[in-house]
Amino acid sequence: MKQEFQYSETHYGAAPCRPDVHGVLIKGKRGRLLSVLYTAAGEGTHPTVLLLHGIPGCEKNYDLAQDLRRAGFHVLSFHYSGSWGSDGDYSLAHDLEDANTALNFILSDERFGFDKDRIYAVGHSLGGFVCGQLSASRPEIRKAVLITPCDIGRLPVIREQAPDYYRAVCEVLEESAD
């Protein structure tokens, strides 16, 4: 006996009221930062997490983004300049600037319902290091979570290739050790 599959459409509310995933291009100093925005269900503004991935990529962080979205947060994850299709050339020295650019996008955008008073940052590995720097310099970030942050300030290659960045990193590490 042949069974027939029945299909019925599910209609959701307006786009801001249902969970969704958006591709977002954020304009940075070296071109576009390719970004993914997870929006939570429900009307009104939502607390927002800026999710900073490590290098080489972010595929390990998407499960965290999904969980945060289910918990009612909007989550923005971007790719650093020169990585994973974002414009420009990659440099560790530009990571913090890219994170500031993404944060400025959250603070200035009016389309997606970001709660500007409830912005959090979460970073893993290199993203954890950048997250620490960002949260130390930007009071708009209420809380930060650093997941196994790397200590790139102690790497000799950074000292040689980007001495100004190395000095800034060492200052942050010394301050956080106090």
What annotation goes with each model-predicted range?
Residues T45-G54:
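Short beta-strand element of the alpha/beta-hydrolase
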Residues H11-P16, G23-L25, A136, I141-D178:
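The alpha/beta-hydrolase serine catalytic core
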Residues K2-E43:
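N-terminal cap/lid segment of alpha/beta-hydrolase-fold proteins
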Residues F112-S125:
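Alpha/beta-hydrolase fold nucleophile elbow
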Residues A65-G85:
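Conserved alpha/beta-hydrolase
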Residues Y90-F112:
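Alpha/beta-hydrolase active-site loop
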Residues G123-Q133:
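Glycine-rich nucleophile elbow surrounding the catalytic serine of serine-hydrolase chemistry
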Residues G54-D67:
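The serine-hydrolase catalytic nucleophile loop
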